[in-house]
């Protein structure tokens, strides 16, 4: 009787572990594909920055500190190898996410400062790069959201019964995802404006009101 119960228990366990196995395979492939697209779009952004920086340097009085921060942020972001294995390492993923968020912030500041330089904003090369950057940032947002959804689906499968038994048997574990506290910053593309009118100096509005 005990032997029969053992056999039934093992058979039941094997049957349950079969539940969700195909789902794991499918969602894992979805994660890899969406991660690849995230990396591609971040790389595209990084490739645009050298030309953007060189164009901005043509503006003799442009704030050097703003440019330096963009250059340093790009260097930090591109120094992290975004390998397929990175999405299985929470610490490495967090480091990658933070570096990309810092680059987004540096680019946003550069675009904000450029509003004060009408000659730069009238430069066709700069305007073209702005448009390319805006398009890339939008594609980053789309790719990141797909990754977030894929990881959420995968992690739910890892944690819920009976697929959690399959996860234990085959070693499937939670994968890191973009943190909620960074999501707003990451998803906010640098502001792009093609209005060539110079920015109003501080105090102008109050002076006009007097």
Regions found by a protein language model. Give the residues of each.
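A helix-centric hydrophobic-segment signal that preferentially recognizes long
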Residues: 2-210
């Amino acid at each position: 009787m005990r032997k029969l119960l053992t056999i039934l228990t093992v058979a039941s366990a094997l049957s349950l572990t079969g539940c969700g196995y195909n789902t794991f395979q499918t969602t894992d492939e979805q994660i890899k594909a969406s991660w690849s697209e995230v990396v591609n779009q971040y790389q595209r952004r990084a490739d645009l920055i050298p030309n953007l920086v060189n164009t901005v340097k043509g503006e003799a009085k442009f704030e050097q500190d703003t440019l330096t921060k963009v250059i340093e942020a790009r260097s930090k972001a591109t120094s992290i190898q975004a390998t397929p294995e990175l999405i299985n390492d929470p610490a490495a993923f967090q480091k990658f996410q933070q570096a990309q968020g810092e680059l987004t912030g540096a680019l946003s500041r550069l675009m904000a400062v450029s509003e004060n330089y009408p000659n730069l904003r009238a430069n066709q090369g700069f305007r073209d790069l702005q448009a390319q950057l805006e398009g890339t940032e939008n594609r980053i947002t789309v790719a990141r959201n797909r990754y977030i959804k894929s990881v959420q689906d995968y992690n739910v499968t890892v944690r819920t019964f009976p697929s959690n038994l399959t996860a234990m048997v085959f070693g499937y574990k939670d994968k890191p995802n973009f943190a909620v506290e960074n999501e707003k910053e990451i998803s906010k593309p640098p502001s792009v404006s093609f209005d060539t009118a110079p920015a109003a100096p501080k105090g102008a509005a109050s002076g006009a009101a007097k």
